[in-house]
Amino acid sequence: WPANYGGVMLQGFYWDSFSDTRWTKLEAQADELSQYFSLIWVPQSGKCLNSGSMGYDPYYYFDQNSAFGTATELKSMIKTFKSKGIGTIADVVVNLHNTDGWFTFPAETWQGATYQLLSTDIVLNDDGGKTLTQATTDGVSLSANYDEGQDWNGCRDLDHKSANVQTVVKAYERFLVKEMGYIGFRYDMVKGFSGSHVADYNDAAGIEYSVGECWDGTGTIRNWIDATSKKSAA
């Protein structure tokens, strides 16, 4: 952003705001919102296994039909906001990923290429070692790398050192920008992986705005921003 940027971002949702945060309802308020806000941050908009999900257990990256509306409605909302001078910020949840069972990730196709995360993209110490125990029982291989940050139980923590993870995430973020019309990202749970990856992902996506969910003391926040080569706020 330019120095001394004076814009204001609205969080366009709250927990379980499935009615108030429907894309059609937000779009209908575009004229009013444009009088006060420059950016609107919306929840993770990909389809989840649970139809009543707020989006923080992502399963599909490229299927944008969610609990808040259809992909068509989402694109319409973003386009309308843009016409009113409002940029839309995607909530990007890539520290972790939901699975069908323990290890099944969906295969998704965009622009003729198919993308799929694999069991070898899961950090070795996921879920405090429970995932490794299950993998041993099932004869499944995990990554040889340990988690770079905090663990998150319930979903698979991704190994962002994996070339496949990097390829999938970069394609996903390009999709959010080029296909859906988002202009920037709010990264969820950035304490779970190195900030250096955020720098790489932002460079690949060519976004205008980035902020990471890093709630902590000044030193920790500063160190995380430095890890991104100052390519993200926090």
Which residues make up each language-model segment?
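Active-site-proximal helices and loops of the catalytic beta/alpha 8
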Residues: 1-11, 15, 25-34, 44-57, ...
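Soluble non-cytosolic domains of exported or imported proteins
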Residues: 4, 17-27, 68, 72, ...
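Polysaccharide-binding and catalytic clefts of secreted carbohydrate-active enzymes
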Residues: 45, 116-182, 190-192, 197-198, ...
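Substrate-binding cleft of carbohydrate-active enzyme catalytic domains
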Residues: 39, 69-112
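Short coil/turn segments at secondary-structure boundaries
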Residues: 62-68
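First exposed extracellular module after export/assembly in secreted or surface-exposed proteins
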Residues: 22, 79, 109-117, 131, ...
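Aromatic- and acidic-residue-enriched segments that line the glycan-binding/catalytic groove
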Residues: 51-60, 96-142, 203-204
